[in-house]
Amino acid sequence: MKILFCSAGRRAELLKDFRNSMGAEGCIIATDMSETAPAIYMADKYYVVPGIEDPEYLSTILEICQKENIDAVTTLIDPEIMLLAMHRDEFKRIGTEVLCPFEETAKICFDKFTMFQYLTENRIQTVLTYGDLDSFFVAYDRGEITFPVFVKPRTGSGSVGARKITDMPELQRAMEGEPGLIIQEYMGDAVDIDVDIYIDTISHQPVSLFSK
């Protein structure tokens, strides 16, 4: 099996683990926009490609998939998930399976406020989240939330821009200076537990899960 890992970046250990799991039967190909990205050197073969915002990016990845007879393609950065999801059919036509969420799921997961709305509508307990200052003011006046709070980009990743806010003036400055922030209740010293769930791409059923 040949798997293409897009935007490999610094995730050398991840590719190394995949290599060990796949054994001699597997072939790993990686791409990145920089030849200095360490993870590409864990692959059997690599390509230096344009950035994901480049108009030629998608056609470049499709061309690599055709040339290398890639069985499956995935990405190691969040912003690229939507791109692959939107063009799933184009990859399927050349015999390449896209290993990422479907477009509808990707839209929900990549937008933190949309995710909050989805969880709330489905009665799944989650962190209180506000998409703008006005809705936060209403909740604050009602005593539903208090300081400190936590702000982060609505569509950000890698904890970039995420930080604790201790009072109203600081919050107003943050929201005015960075459009697109959301406001969340501060979880304090709560224990952070990540849960990974693996879904079979054919049956769409969960096959394994573990916490870390």
Predicted features by range, described:
Residues M1-L99:
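ATP-binding N-terminal substructure of ATP-dependent carboxylate-amine bond-forming enzymes
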Residues A37-A43, D141-E144, R173-G177:
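Short loop/helix-cap segments at secondary-structure boundaries that form the rim of catalytic
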Residues Y46-I52, L128-L133, R163-T166:
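Short acidic-hydrophobic, aromatic-tinged amphipathic segments that line or gate anion-handling sites
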Residues I64-I70, G143-I145, E178:
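Glycine-rich phosphate-binding loop signature in dinucleotide/nucleotide-binding domains
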Residues T96, E104-D132, V138-E144:
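Glycine-/Pro-rich loop/turn segments that contact NAD(P) or position catalytic residues
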Residues L119-T120, D141-G161, P179-A190, L209-S211:
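ATP-grasp fold ATP-binding core
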Residues R163-K212:
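Phosphate-binding site of ATP-dependent enzymes
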